[in-house]
Amino acid sequence: MACTEFSFHVPSLEELAEVLQKGLKDNFAHVQVSVVDCPDLTKEPFTFPVKGICGQTRIAEVGGVPYLLPLVNKKKVYDLNEIAKEIKLPGAFILGAGAGPFQTLGFNSEFMPIVQTASEHHQPVNGSYFARANPADGKCLLEKYSQKYPDFGCALLANLFASEGQPGKVIEVQAKKRTGEHNFVSCMRQTLEKHYGDKPVGMGGTFLVQKGKVKAHIMPAEFSSCSLNSDEAVNQWLNFYEMKAPLVCLPVFVSKDPGLDLRLEHTHFFSHHGEGGHYHYDTTPDTVEYLGYFSPAQFLYRIDQPKETHAFGRD
């Protein structure tokens, strides 16, 4: 697979915390950003296979929306253990947002990769989830992937944050009561873009929606047989939902595209009450509460970039 490597601008955690504190204040009534020790992510509500998101951090964007839209390209299937090798970090802990491995599932779905990949020292562990619209009633059906399937596949497109999965210092972001127009991730990403300009900064990690509800979507199980050539057509195809806290979210975002046709932000989420999908924004600005832990990425790996591209279907 073709792979392009790019070095991000990596400010200190203290500087990033200061920048995010100022930017988030324009969008939330209560904001507290600080540098802390990463909480133990093996514990609830995260239940990840590793304790942290630190060590040799990188972002990988694999494939892209043009492999899904306007019509699906079913040749575009991937393996997360192989992706870990591509990004020069076998054994990496990978989290993020992507399309479910239809090659195994037999249908299309939203995918929440949470994987400690294989290395010489340990077997891989798959903590991933997938969400689909229940064929019976159209409601969300969230399942843990490894309870049914032994592989480490994904497909079409994925935005991934990878690390050694180590404990360490991270940026903690608390934000309550949204007063602005932007969602939590967009606000952070745009704050970084405004401050750092042409020096791209990449970040990933996890955040909780502790209170409130969010607008989400789940792709249909059947790929579209007719061309979807606009955001309007895509939105008519998608299934939209309102889902309630507590939600565990897996954000990946980049402040500015260095010319690699990136999806600048992409967040999927799961929960322990059967809801999961693609995060758009909260629908309860007065009561919403976010708590997140983030780490800056050192490198970007653009894997299997589509040669023919377009700008729709990336919300």
UniProtKB/Swiss-Prot annotation:
Zn(2+) binds at H266, H268, H278. Exhibits ester hydrolase activity on the substrate p-nitrophenyl acetate, in vitro. Regulates DNA damage and repair by regulating HIF1A degradation via chaperone-mediated autophagy (CMA). Monomer. PANTHER family: ESTER HYDROLASE C11ORF54 (PTHR13204:SF1), PTD012 PROTEIN (PTHR13204). One of its GO terms (biological process) is regulation of DNA repair. Keywords: Cytoplasm, Hydrolase, Metal-binding, Nucleus, Zinc. Its cofactor is Zn(2+). Its main location: nucleus. InterPro entries: C11orf54_DUF1907 (IPR015021). It is found in: Nucleus; Cytoplasm. CDD domains: DUF1907 (cd17298). Pfam families: DUF1907. It is an enzyme of class 3 (hydrolase). It comes from the Eukaryota. This is Ester hydrolase C11orf54 homolog. GO terms for molecular function: hydrolase activity, acting on ester bonds; zinc ion binding. One of its GO terms (cellular component) is nuclear body.
